Structures are given as structure tokens and as C-alpha cells.
Amino acid sequence: MTAAQFSSARLARAKAILRSHVEHDVRDGGIPGLVALVSRRGEVHVEALGVRDLSSAAPMERDTLFRISSMTKPITAAAALILVEECKLRLDDPVDPWLPELAGRRVLRRLDSPLHDTVPAERPISVRDLLTFRMGFGQVMAPPDAHPILKAANERQIGMGPPQPAALPAPDEWLRRLGELPWMAQPGERWLYNTSSDALGVLIARCSGQPLPVFLRERLFEPLGMKDTAFSVPEHAVARMSTSYFNDFQTGELAVYDPIGGQWSHPPAFPSGGAGLVSSIGDYYAFAQMLLEHGRHGGERILSRAAVELMTSDQLSPHQKALGGLLPGDFDHQGWGFGVSITTRRQQLSAPVGSYGWDGGLGTTWSNDPSEGVIALLMTCRLWTSPRRPPVALDFATSVYQALES
């Protein structure tokens, strides 16, 4: 008989903790609904709690569809590594042949410099720079008009805030607009969030000769059996979507960010490699399990062990960590691989050193723990209000680890 991987009593406690977040007043941080999955060495538990839409009270289901936003990034990184394995891309080669719009960059002297106050880039952008978010351009935690470069980037609608698929132009136009701007930092100098993944998606499409949605479907989603994951939801599945909610700071009320049948119900002009996908918890579990199995899915190899090990190992130098992440102290206990965060110091009753994963700001989080064989997935329909994980995500992570049997 196989030993239990989780304590049944402690799993019941974990469910009660999650239910408390669902039953809490939504005007005071409560979650309308969620789906949670924990897995360890073949033992899988899934819970669906609350509703996926407040107005209809439609219940959350195991196959409810969520906008996974930045949990798209690990998938895009894995797709790029497929092309690296095929030697169509090399990690340290310049991206200029594929993305000539980004060649010959100028770099701001300081983040707050006028757009004309620049110096030449010291080297081209590499594939590795895109995978590690060190291309020299990205999101900054500041008001949209805090610096000239932020104002210019927002005016060009290149995706400097929460995902808005309907607002972004087609890939060629997106890259042209990005190429008009000076960089915020020298290539390879520091970690800057998000834009690298969007540029990586364009690189994958141009290198493979296929639109990004087609490449992901043929090379990742179909082999992994991920039937629910795409950049838009087909008409027959729209009823399974959750409504996406956010906290309206002006009114103090919970408001609709994207309704069922909203922006993700039709193919976008720009398939965002950084934040564009819709998925279900079962689909993302298949992707997470493939990584935990060192690139294998059933009898098929999707990625090499070497690719997965590189993707899930810390790529940042101490100097780059000292320059900071989205918020001060982000890299005190974590690093960054290829599209994933790596735990470098355990600071909570949750994922230990060597664990990896990432969050989606529209309300999702994922972690793989190779040492314990644990996969933890939480999908909610409420936006995070900060890059810091909200209480429901922190409590979920703690609940998973308090429930493990030795």
C-alpha cells in the first residue's frame, strides 16, 4: 500500500482556510471564488470553492477558465527552449537577425532622463537576455507619467500595466513602437519585468515561421493534452469562464475587470507571451508536472532535462539582485531563471530552497517543489492589488506545506 502523501485532517484544515477567504466579505478582501490543486508523488487533490460570477452565482468548477496573465511567462520560456534545443536559436546569440527593430539601441543615462539623453548600447540583446528579463526595458513600479520613458511607453500602448488584449497592436507594429524608445538599462545589466516575455513571443513566431498561438498549440499544448489553454476562449467554452474582478480604489467596491465573454473571448491582435493566456487548473497542472518530471510527459519528452534544469536555476548575479526587482527586497530570498522565480532562501512555512514558479497578477499562483515532489496551484478571479502576494495566496502556500506527511 502506498503511503499517504498528505494528512487528511490537515487537508481539511487547508480547505477550511481557503473557504474562509471565499466567505469573507468581498468588499474587505474576500475572494468570489477559487480553484486549488495540490499534488505530491501522484496524489492529487482539487477543490473548487465559491462562484465564478457574482451576478449569476454560477459555481466554480474544476474546469473553470481563468486569465492566467503572468503565468504565461513560464510557458513562453519553455517554448523558446524548444527552439534552442533545435539549434534554431542560441542562448547567447544576438536577436538582431530576428528582431531588427531592436538593433542599435540607445540607452537612457538615468531612468528619469529626457528621452534624448542617451548613450549607445554596449552590446546587442541576446536570447538569454529575453529569457532572464535583462533586455534593458520593462515595467517599473511608478506612476505611468513618473518619468519621460514611462509616459512615452504608455502612450505607445506596448503593455506597461495589467493585461488588456484589446489595447495592443499586432506584433510587427508592437515591436516597431518598442523600437522607437530608448532602453532603461544596458542589455544584461539589470532585471526589468514583463516586456522581455512579450518580445520573446515575437522572437518565437519569427524564428519558427509560425504565429505564437500555433507554435504553442502544436509544440506544447497538444503534446501535453492542454485543451483549455489559448490566447482566447472559443464560443463553445465561454460559459466556463470566470468573471475577473478588481478592487476599485475610488469606490471601495469590487468591480468587473473583464466579464465573461470579454476581451479574452476573441483572438487578440497581439498574442502576449508575457500575460495573454487563458487556462484551467488541470491544463496548467499538466505543464507543471512536465517540468517536475524533468521535461517528460507520459512516454514523450517535451524538453530535455538540461533545458528544464537551466530554466529553473537562478540566473541573476548578486549585483543584478542588488539593483532590485519590482519592489525593494524582492531578491532577498528569490532569484530568477527563464520565466520563473526561484526560491533561494526559505522565509515562510511554504516552498523550500530550489522551488520555482510564478504568479499571475489577475489572481493566480503556481509553485513546483522538486525536493518534496509538490505542485501547488491556486486560481482565483480577483486581481492582486500589489506585486506582493495577497493573504489568500500566502495562506494557500502555508496550508499546502502544513498538510504534508513525512
Predicted features along the sequence, with ranges:
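Active-site SXXK
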Residues: 18-22, 41-42, 67-95, 197-205, ...
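Short, surface-exposed loop or secondary-structure junction motifs
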Residues: 46, 106-353
